[in-house]
Curated annotation (Swiss-Prot):
Encoded by the cryptic lambdoid prophage DLP12. This is Prophage Rz endopeptidase RzpD. Necessary for host cell lysis. It is believed to code for an endopeptidase that cleaves the amino-carboxyl cross-link between the diaminopimelic acid and D-alanine residues in the murein component of the bacterial cell wall. The keyword Transcription does not apply.
């Protein structure tokens, strides 16, 4: 029986070694997968944080854009209303000007008849166009500065 006992003992030792090797192999795989899982979880967390940050920035930029777009539209509407009022005669466009006097031969000497200062129609249109463009540029510049100060720092 000692020979049978030796064979059985050898078989049991082989089975134990084989099972130990299998357990060690699967344990190493489990550790490797855990490391991969943890790494991917960290990367996912960072990606989600970046997405959240970008979404927040997009909302901020959209709100900023809406604010300055509204201000620009309001300024243009005010400029158009002013232009319409001047064209309809409800308001007058006052420009500091000096008129040259016109001397007439029939008037007494030393009395001047000055013509009232007035812009030519094209100059008036150009004034309002320039005013509108200045307002547009100012609002665009303010919006860009606000964007740079809030988003690029």
């Amino acid at each position: 029986m000692s020979r049978v006992t030796a064979i059985i003992s050898a078989l049991i030792i082989c089975i134990i070694v084989s099972l130990s090797w299998a357990v060690n192999h699967y344990r190493d795989n489990a550790i490797a997968y855990k490391v991969q899982r943890d790494k991917n979880a960290r990367e996912l967390k960072l990606a989600n944080a970046a997405i959240t940050d970008m979404q927040m920035r997009q909302r901020d930029v959209a709100a900023l854009d809406a604010k300055y777009t509204k201000e620009l539209a309001d300024a243009k509407a005010e400029n158009d209303a002013l232009r319409d009022d001047v064209a309809a005669g409800r308001r007058r466009l006052h420009i500091k000007a000096v008129c040259q006097s016109v001397r007439e031969a029939t008037t007494a000497s030393g009395v001047d008849n000055a013509a009232s200062p007035r812009l030519a129609d094209t100059a008036e249109r150009d004034y309002f166009t320039l005013r509108e463009r200045l307002i547009t540029m100012q609002k665009q510049l303010e919006g860009t500065q606000k964007y740079i100060n809030e988003q690029c720092r």
